[in-house]
Amino acid sequence: MPNPYFSFKQFTVYHDRCAMKVGTDGVLLGAWADVVSARNILDIGTGTGLISLMMAQRCNARIRAVDIDADAVEQARGNVAASPWQDRIEVELQDICHFTSETLFDVIVSNPPYFTDSLKCPGKQRNIARHTDFLDFDKLAGSAARLLHPEGVFSVIIPADGKESFLMAATRYGLHLSHQTFIHTKPGSEPKRVLLAFKFSVDKCVIDDLTIELSRHVYSEEYIALTKEFYLNM
């Protein structure tokens, strides 16, 4: 039977009620996203609450986390309640397309649905979590642009082959790429994921790569440096 939780250095995430379990994508985004000077953070499609918890560990901002799946929201609330940062994270059952806030957000993060063109997997929950039928790139970019502070940053992790589609969507709403990191599972491999950061105004775009493993269970120095504050054995 799969373990119902995943333990990090400062918090534990239960994921037995969530369609999408704790995985590398969420950890990468939670560790990579720029939170310098952040005061208000929005986590779109929070799932287990993992990324919100990582944001809370990294900075002192107030965080609002939203998801459209009721089971995920309840589980995320439980994970937040058991963490050291329950007073700074609010988890809400919300469709981001209808979400409103009196405050614009310095940082917006999302590990959005993907596999647009693949066959749907069994189960409505997992389809919501993994397919862009429920939140396509255009709606996500539009919602982020509507809620982002003029000086803020919007960060996502998506499949590498979806990058151009996401860039087109972001550009339609005045968002410009400020940082791009291709993720390679091993040296020389084609990137499977890409981390993207957007701002309304950009002087230059930083483009780099990150390799996770040098060989089986031998992690790169860059990956260790990025995630060592979270993973127990890093």
Curated annotation (Swiss-Prot):
GO cellular component, one term: cytoplasm
MF terms (GO), sorted A to Z: nucleic acid binding; tRNA (adenine-N6)-methyltransferase activity
EC number from the UniProt entry: 2.1.1.223
UniProt xrefs under SUPFAM superfamilies: S-adenosyl-L-methionine-dependent methyltransferases (SSF53335)
Catalytic activity, as annotated: adenosine(37) in tRNA1(Val) + S-adenosyl-L-methionine = N(6)-methyladenosine(37) in tRNA1(Val) + S-adenosyl-L-homocysteine + H(+)
InterPro entries hit by this protein: DNA_methylase_N6_adenine_CS, SAM-dependent_MTases_sf, Small_mtfrase_dom, tRNA_Adenine-N(6)_MTase, tRNA_adenine-N6_MeTrfase
Main subcellular location of this protein, as a coarse class: cytoplasm
Family the UniProt entry places it in: Belongs to the methyltransferase superfamily. tRNA (adenine-N(6)-)-methyltransferase family.
Functional note: Specifically methylates the adenine in position 37 of tRNA(1)(Val) (anticodon cmo5UAC).
Name the UniProt record assigns to this protein: tRNA1(Val) (adenine(37)-N6)-methyltransferase
